[in-house]
Amino acid sequence: MRPIRVLVAKPGLDGHDRGAKVVAAALRDAGMEVIYTGLHQTPEMIATAAIQEDVDVVGLSILSGAHMTLFPRVLELLRAEDRGDILITGGGIIPKEDMDALHAMGTGRLFGPGTPTSELVSYIKAWFAEQSQQRA
C-alpha cells in the first residue's frame, strides 16, 4: 500500500509553529509522506498545494482563533475543485462547540492542546484504511 500523503499547514498570521512541526515529524515517523507549508499560508495557498501535491489529508494548525473562518474556507476551495475527498483535520485552541460545528460542515476530527500525536496518527491511518476499502 502506498504511503499516506499529508499536507501540514499554518494558515493565517499565527507565528507559532512548534506544534505543527511536532505533528509533521510524528506523521513522518509513522511512515506518512508529509509536506509542511510553513507559516502564514492563505486558504487559497493551502488548497492549491493540497491539489498540486495530490495529498490525502490536510492538517491545519490554528492557534489564532480564526478556525471558524479558515477551516470552512479550505473546505470550500477544495470542494470547488472537486477534491472534497481530501480529509481536513487539524487542531489548536478550538472550543468543543466550534469543533462540533466544523465537523457538521465537513471537517474530520479536530484535536485540542495536549492530544498525544499517536492519537492523530491512529485517526489518519484508520480514516485512510476506510477510504481505501471504499475505493476497492
Q: Where do the language-model regions lie?
A:
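N-terminal pre-triad scaffold of radical SAM enzymes
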Residues: 9-13
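Cofactor-cradling patches in redox/metallo enzymes
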Residues: 20-122, 127-130
